[in-house]
């Protein structure tokens, strides 16, 4: 039993809404620029056209699930070439490690979709309701016509943004103009409507209401980044040695000689989209967006103090400044052993993908020997092996391919259903052709257990040849 005087505490901290104040400065301008570029690419890219010739889609970027292909301008990726996608994912991971090791959570602060869309939603919120103080007053006031009108306007605009976000996503998976007409006329596949509705709801919820909660609780990266950062990593930090002891600045009175440069104006806290105080040190919630730097620099200008009370610096630099030593240059923090290793790995994977892309053949073959039975003895005593040759024509037109065999032994080749050794494969199609290889009675290949051979496939129009090595099974006497 618990006594009436027993106090219980909850492990759950109720969320306090965060209303970032408008701020201007070089980092805010950089965030606006990155937001415009990333959103522009996301919304416009599905509408870009790229002429690939007949029998191929003309959408520049297309994930064609129906035909199991991915198009990116002049590049076409087939299902068996998924290693290109795997390579790109590896490069993305290494790039994230590189940027985090060099400059902290710059991805989170500038280019993460959660950050970009939250910035856009806050921009709409500020345009409808006003700046920070006005939004706080509106939240606290009782529901009336003005509050209802502003909230409905804001939510409607958020829903439209979410709808555009979901719509843009589905446009990447089929021809965008055609799908748009189908969506408007109700003829689109139910999956398209379900996907749009899901993304609209999640964008509306994450960008409008969850915001910083996604970064703190749902995203694993704040916890992973601890292993990527060290004392040489450049990140947003407060120069405590310069700002403390902090104190209020009264109008018309100079700062006390014993007082630090921080006047406890809370400007850095008021502009933070995460609602944290950077003066408390490094925190899991900090996304390194640097808006607190812009806000603090503006205050320092007003009170006649040098900028940089809050800035990008490494912990070793802060320690050096505290001890009166000169900090290292930013480039020496960026280009150090760890970042150079990440750069080398990233470049190596990228170079390997480029080489593989340029060396890949427009003809793809796969040869499967039939194992049951391993060979067949014909009426004249010769030995026949059977193979399934899978041909993939990656061209935009039908091609004739000639199949031949080379070996140290004397072998003959024939095709099932074709009097000649030439087969036609339609454009952008895959076809399986049964091939017979025969060794005459008493020949070395017929009597040996195994004989190496090479199957050749030649594109008669382009003169290109590819081969596949396999074996011929004999009696083994």
Curated annotation (Swiss-Prot):
Any one Gene Ontology cellular component term annotated for this protein: plasma membrane
Ranges that cross the membrane: 30-50, 82-102, 155-175, 190-210, 339-359
Residue span(s) of domain 4Fe-4S ferredoxin-type: 253-281
InterPro entries to which the protein is assigned, alphabetical: 4Fe4S_Fe-S-bd, 4Fe4S_Fe_S_CS, Cyt_c_oxidase_cbb3_FixG, Electron_Trans/Redox, FixG_C, Ig-like_fold
Matching Pfam families: Fer4_18, Fer4_5, FixG_C
Annotated residues for binding of [4Fe-4S] cluster 2: 272, 286, 289, 292
UniProt topological domain (Periplasmic) ranges: 51-81, 176-189, 360-477
Known function: Involved in a membrane generated redox signal; required to maintain repression of photosynthesis gene expression in the presence of oxygen.
Stated name of the protein: Protein RdxB
Species assigned in the record: Cereibacter sphaeroides (strain ATCC 17023 / DSM 158 / JCM 6121 / CCUG 31486 / LMG 2827 / NBRC 12203 / NCIMB 8253 / ATH 2.4.1.)
